[in-house]
Amino acid sequence: MLGLQIFTLLSIPTLLYTYEIEPLERTSTPPEKELGYWCTYANHCRFCWDCQDGICRNKAFKNHSPILENNYIANCSIYRRNDFCIYYITSIKPHKTYRTECPQHINHERHEADIRKWQKLLTYGFYLAGCILAVNYIRKRSLQTVMYLLVFLVISFLLSQLMLYGELEDKKHKIGSIPPKRELEHWCTHGKYCNFCWDCQNGICKNKAFKNHPPIGENDFIRYDCWTTHLPNKCSYEKIYKHFNTHIMECSQPTHFKWYDNLMKKQDIM
């Protein structure tokens, strides 16, 4: 009976720690606070653009260059469940569907603070359970029973601590201004204006990640210095231009969106 009480005491913080993100029913208008996420992946969806008089401006990224309204901008719907997000291109028959992984922890500092809070709770629970064992030993003098329970308690406590410390260890940032060559396709799908994606000579720039990308003229659009951050399940890049502008995406997200193909059919990417 005492062992069951101790196990329950140790399990409560772990159960409280787990949570699910809020579902989102199918809609063509994502919440404004989520536009940055959706428009990082589905940057051709109409909900990302404000089009007036044939000129379209990006709603999520205000410093994105205006583009001409064209067939590249498609009607889309989005849908979210606990462990995945989906967007549909409804302008095409049959509908094209893309599955992404939803951001679980946008604010990493808050996530780490939560983990440390549960570590403290587990520590206090360990002390409390130790007091219960001591009282039980004094009352019943059953040393063998107390030793079994103590071993069980220590093992449970260590496993819980290892799980949480491992979570923190995995969150260490890997930061650099130039991503590894093998990751260029991922970073240049999302951070296409970062200067590490382009090789510029004599005013002509070629894309390093996508060899079949048409050459473009050197201009301010591709002169941004970017810092990349690579976590186990999330990547972000910061565009350094007057002030830091951070964009977050999932590292495991497929990179073969070929965002430029349809756009280049209608206009220069400028």
From Swiss-Prot:
UniProt subcellular location: Membrane
Cytoplasmic side: 139-145
One GO location term (cellular component): membrane
One Pfam family hit: v110
InterPro entries: ASFV_fam_110
Coiled coil: none
Cystine residue pairs: none
Keywords: Early protein, Glycoprotein, Membrane, Repeat, Signal, Transmembrane, Transmembrane helix
A repeats: 27-146
Induction remarks: Expressed in the immediate early phase of the viral replicative cycle.
Chain positions carrying an annotated carbohydrate: 75
Renumbered ranges of B repeats: 147-270
Family indicated by similarity: Belongs to the asfivirus MGF 110 family.
Role noted for this protein: Plays a role in virus cell tropism, and may be required for efficient virus replication in macrophages.
Name under which the protein is recorded: Protein MGF 110-1L
Organism phylogeny: Viruses, Varidnaviria, Bamfordvirae, Nucleocytoviricota, Pokkesviricetes
